[in-house]
Amino acid sequence: MSLAPSSYPSLYSSPSLPRTQQTKQNPSLITQSSFISAKSLFLSSNSASLCNTHVAKRRNLALKASETESSAKAEAGGDGEEEEKYETYEIEVEQPYGLKFRKGRDGGTYIDAILPGGSADKTGKFTVGDRVIATSAVFGTEIWPAAEYGRTMYTIRQRIGPLLMQMEKRNGKAEDTGELTEKEIIRAERNAGYISSRLREIQMQNYLKKKEQKAQREKDLREGLQFSKNGKYEEALERFESVLGSKPTPEEASVASYNVACCYSKLNQVQAGLSALEEALKSGYEDFKRIRSDPDLETLRKSKDFDPLLKQFDESFINESAINAIKSLFGFNKK
């Protein structure tokens, strides 16, 4: 409750009535004065009752308006517009998890794809669109609530041992993507009353959203590179992972994944680094000379799995191997 300002003294106290000296008066005048006072009281009483009547009317109107709003809300709720409650489940997966994730409009982490034959696929529990609500910590048995996308992906990639995941089952509904869903479009059209202009508005919203996401990806990439340059690899990973979760172009995905691999290499996280490097190669990264000479990847190059990984994608190496095989077949390599 707020206090009334001091400029309104009537809200604080009533002014005292003026004092008059008692004088001898004509009885008739006294009676008349008394009559006027009684009349004034009568009028005050009537006006009070009138005020109460108006207040009662206003209350009735307010109640009717409230009932109308309630009925309107009930009708609106009949279309299934109420916030939906989702089932949760908990499951443990082994590496390779066989899951791809994306960043939702709310900054959360959602399943974007389930790779056939992976640990997640074998459980039969996951569906595309399910939301991550908690995961195992990097070490031990502690459970960490899912933070924003970059931090959650950092935890998942760094996890040593089986990964326990607490999920929110969305039943295949991917409603938190960057664009308006079909359900949202239909709802918007119904509320707008005229479809054509609303559709144009939705298309414009989607265009602006894509433009905004692209600008954000570029910003995250620049900040990630700066963090990496300053040796702040964990902060850099959050930015690069955010790029990867925001529907990047193949070129953006390849560059971001390559930098993720470099960061994990500097943090001596070999398996996570090799996984990110594989994603970079699958996204079209082809600077194999740089991969074999970049000092940031030195730790990964020491791994026995490094060369076999590159040989899967390096066509120049494949062609060289094919030529050597042919030479051996026809005896050209014999001295």
Swiss-Prot record:
Transit peptide feature, positions:
1-73
What is any one of the record's Gene Ontology cellular component terms? chloroplast stroma
* SUPFAM superfamilies cross-referenced by the UniProt entry: PDZ domain-like, TPR-like
Q: Where in the cell is it found?
A: Plastid, Chloroplast membrane; Plastid, Chloroplast thylakoid membrane
Q: Spans of biased composition, class Acidic residues? A: 78-88
- State the TPR repeat positions: 217-250, 254-287, 289-323
Top-rank taxon, per record: Eukaryota
Query: What tissues contain this protein?
Result: Expressed in leaves (at protein level). Mostly expressed in leaves, stems and siliques, and, to a lower extent, in flowers and senescent leaves, but not present in roots (at protein level).
PDZ domain mapped to chain residues:
97-136
Question: Mainly localized where?
Answer: plastid
Any one Gene Ontology biological process term?
A: photosynthesis
Q: How is it modified after translation?
A: Phosphorylated rapidly (e.g. within 5 minutes) but transiently at threonine and serine residues after wounding.
Question: What does the induction field say?
Answer: Repressed by wounding at the transcript level, but not at the protein level. Strong level decrease during senescence. Low levels observed in etiolated leaves and accumulates rapidly during light-induced greening.
Low complexity: compositionally biased ranges: 1-18
Describe the task this protein carries out: Involved in photosystem II supercomplex formation and repair, probably acting as a psbB/psbC chaperone on the stromal side of the membrane.
What name does this protein carry?
Protein MET1, chloroplastic
Q: Which organism is it from?
A: Arabidopsis thaliana (Mouse-ear cress)
